[in-house]
Each structure stands twice: as C-alpha cells, then as structure tokens.
Amino acid sequence: MPRIIGIDIPAKKKLKISLTYIYGIGPALSEEIIAKLQLNPEARAAELTEEEIGRLNSLLQSDYVVEGDLRRRVQSDIKRLISIHAYRGQRHRLSLPVRGQRTKTNSRTRKGKRKTVAGKKK
C-alpha cells in the first residue's frame, strides 16, 4: 500500500480511485492531480515509483488543503458560524438540518433517534 501524505491508499485499485481515499479529494480533483503530474490514470497505485510518490506528496502539501487541515478548517468554519450567531450556526448547534430541509418529518440522521413524547390527555 503506497503511503501518500500519511494515508495508506489501496494498491490494487487504479490511481484515480485510490486518490479518492484521501479526505478532500474526489474523482474530479483526482483526475486534475493526475493530469498535472502527467501520471498514467490507468496505472495501479502499487505501480507508482518512489519519485512519483514524492511528487504527489509535495503537490498535495503545497497546492491543496486535504486531510487534517481540511477537517480543521471545516470545524473552525462551523465554530465561527456558531460564535457570530448566524442562522446556519444555530442550526449546527441544535443538530438540525442546515440547508433548509423540512424537519416535521424526515431529518432523522441529524436529529438522532426518536424521543417519545407523552400524548395529550382529554
């Protein structure tokens, strides 16, 4: 398993797919990186030479925000929204959907397991 910026990527998968195992790199960015470094997109990750891995590491560290830095940036953005009392920040704080989805039904992922409320007595 080749190790790129501290992450083990799958050796048997094609390079385009293997790079997507790094947080912050999707299929489009993976293709862009491969084109920029002039690597063979059909090659397997195990076929990378030490020199190519070094070029890949240096490019990702210098030009892209990925892995821990990206996770920290996202968390700091959420904390900033909460601290300035923005609507989106309040939705994050209350663990509710942030982007305007309905909450009367659905949104169970954000709200968590159902909490039973006693029925109204007649």
Curated annotation (Swiss-Prot):
Region ranges (Disordered): 93-122
Coiled coil: none
Family annotation (InterPro entries): Rbsml_uS13_C (IPR027437), Ribosomal_uS13 (IPR001892), Ribosomal_uS13-like_H2TH (IPR010979), Ribosomal_uS13_bac-type (IPR019980), Ribosomal_uS13_CS (IPR018269)
Pfam families: Ribosomal_S13
Entry keywords, A to Z: Ribonucleoprotein, Ribosomal protein, RNA-binding, rRNA-binding, tRNA-binding
A cellular component term, taken from the record's GO annotations: small ribosomal subunit
Task of the protein: Located at the top of the head of the 30S subunit, it contacts several helices of the 16S rRNA. In the 70S ribosome it contacts the 23S rRNA (bridge B1a) and protein L5 of the 50S subunit (bridge B1b), connecting the 2 subunits; these bridges are implicated in subunit movement. Contacts the tRNAs in the A and P-sites.
Family: Belongs to the universal ribosomal protein uS13 family.
Biased composition annotated in UniProt, kind: Basic residues: 101-122
Subunit and interaction comment: Part of the 30S ribosomal subunit. Forms a loose heterodimer with protein S19. Forms two bridges to the 50S subunit in the 70S ribosome.
Entry GO MF terms: rRNA binding; structural constituent of ribosome; tRNA binding
GO biological process, one term: translation
Protein name: Small ribosomal subunit protein uS13
